[in-house]
């Protein structure tokens, strides 16, 4: 019987998606997240508070590797990559540990963390292996969470989805920068966008996004390609959405202003509390006006508008 190895990485909450993505790049066949926030129950209203559950500062990212992989090498590579990112993100004290699993244990272990989750008023994320019957008006996003890159339940992704739900009215062109799992592109299509162009610098993310898009019928209007932010892009958009690190977002705002149509929107998420002012200043310097600011725990997200009429925006 084939055996598997379970590598658990304990890290501050801010590092969830970063560590998950790195583990996939380092050959993980599946990734699961253990987070106290997951036990607050699924909600159909953004921002609901559950005071009876204490939010822990740390989460555990569990990655699964076949026994042919030398996990000690993975650990060393991961530590080296994380060390390079300490200036961008406080990951806390990173702890790692490995245990062996039988194949049936691996198959059951990582899937048990994922159930259908109502993320916003309209959008529900459903694991690809689950049969789920939608209620009237409910829009279903099928994902394979085992490939990581944002399963839709992380606060940064939730706020991005909520923002898309608020600004999309139908017929828009959307640019999804740093698409990861493709979840924001899929949501944009379900919410009525006419055409979506998704970009990611990571070749693995491009492949994963395409695979997730293919799990969802009617997504022919999504185009996925490798790309470095918006460099070289000449497509005008009604909405640009980017759920990436704050230190990268500030290099996006000028190109975003160039490409967003008048009265269009720039949605940004993935911003830890200490970086919010920096991102806001970057967007406003580019010419955008802040319309919506969202906060969930340590995370910030925002909707900026390209407009000459500032009467309806914050501070206007």
From Swiss-Prot:
Binding site for S-adenosyl-L-methionine: 157, 178, 200, 243
GO MF terms held by the record: protein methyltransferase activity; protein-lysine N-methyltransferase activity
SUPFAM superfamilies (alphabetical): S-adenosyl-L-methionine-dependent methyltransferases
Cellular component, GO, one term: cytoplasm
First-level EC class: transferase
UniProt EC number: 2.1.1.-
Presence of the UniProt keyword Methyltransferase in the record: yes
Subcellular location(s) per record: Cytoplasm
UniProt keyword list: Cytoplasm, Methyltransferase, S-adenosyl-L-methionine, Transferase
GO process annotations (BP): methylation
Reactions listed under catalytic activity: L-lysyl-[protein] + 3 S-adenosyl-L-methionine = N(6),N(6),N(6)-trimethyl-L-lysyl-[protein] + 3 S-adenosyl-L-homocysteine + 3 H(+)
Entries under CDD domains matching the protein: AdoMet_MTases (cd02440)
NCBIfam families: prmA (TIGR00406)
Function: Methylates ribosomal protein L11.
Family according to the record: Belongs to the methyltransferase superfamily. PrmA family.
Designated name of the protein: Ribosomal protein L11 methyltransferase
Organism, scientific name: Streptococcus pneumoniae (strain ATCC BAA-255 / R6)
Organism placement in taxonomy: Bacteria, Bacillati, Bacillota, Bacilli, Lactobacillales
Gene: prmA
